[in-house]
Curated annotation (Swiss-Prot):
This is 3-oxo-tetronate 4-phosphate decarboxylase. Its cofactor is Zn(2+). Its EC number is 4.1.1.104. The gene is otnC. It catalyses: 3-dehydro-4-O-phospho-D-erythronate + H(+) = dihydroxyacetone phosphate + CO2; 3-dehydro-4-O-phospho-L-erythronate + H(+) = dihydroxyacetone phosphate + CO2. InterPro entries: Aldolase_class_II_sugar_metab, Aldolase_II/adducin_N, Aldolase_II/adducin_N_sf, OtnC. Binds 1 zinc ion per subunit. GO terms for cellular component: cytosol. It is an enzyme of class 4 (lyase).
Length: 212
């Protein structure tokens, strides 16, 4: 086995492990959600369409080109289009996680969210891990406009909320993207736990210090 093949096999196993962890801990249910990562040769490895994140076969993961051409494995999800849009427009993005996790999806269904940043910072971690979390308007799953909107937002952001749909998070590795997704989900959970109680938000100076 060549060095490249060994790296690819390791990444396949990592994707399967992380996806299974999401499923086992209740971040994903049924066949909802998809993950992807960039391979060293520029191709993309992604979870197949209709697949359960808790029961993936490393050898059947979808491989597609940077242009979206299906190369091998099972058929890729139609949502791979917006994964590709993120990779093309943010060179720091090496992996993408999209889930229908309970708390973030619930947050995406609320009216009156700030489309520029749905989470006003009240803990340091959302600032340190994700920065702003813009809202993408609702479109039917698979609609090309999701990819178009994410492409416009990708350069300056690494976490997004698809209205009435769920979260999308990038990372410089799949593990980092997974960590960022968990931070977003836990922050969304805190928003609902706090409810209408007065929140002590971080000040502009505190946010600037975290970003420096």
């Amino acid at each position: 086995m060549s060095d490249f093949a060994k790296v690819e096999q390791s990444l396949r196993e990592e994707m399967t492990r992380i996806a299974s962890s999401f499923f086992q801990r209740g971040y994903a249910t049924g066949s909802a959600g998809n993950l992807s990562l960039l391979l060293p040769d520029g191709n993309l490895l992604a979870t197949p369409t209709g697949s359960c994140l808790g029961n993936l076969d490393p050898q059947r993961l979808s491989k597609v080109t940077a242009d979206g051409e299906w190369l091998s494995g099972d058929k890729p999800s139609k949502e791979v289009l917006f994964h590709l849009a993120l990779y093309r427009n943010n060179p720091r993005c090496k992996a993408v996680v999209h889930l229908h996790s309970t708390w973030s999806t619930a947050l995406s269904c609320l009216e009156g969210l700030d489309s520029n940043n749905v989470i006003r910072p009240f803990t340091p971690y959302v600032v340190m891990r994700m920065g702003n979390v813009p809202l993408v308007p609702y479109y039917r799953p698979g609609d090309k406009r999701i990819a178009q909107d994410l492409a416009e937002l990708a350069a300056d952001n690494q976490a997004f909320l698809l209205a009435n749909h769920g979260p999308v998070v990038c990372g410089e590795s799949l593990q980092e993207a997974a960590n960022n997704m968990e931070e977003l989900e836990e922050t969304a959970k805190l928003i609902f736990i706090l409810g209408d109680r007065p929140i002590r938000y971080l000040t502009a100076g505190e946010i600037a210090e975290l970003r420096s």
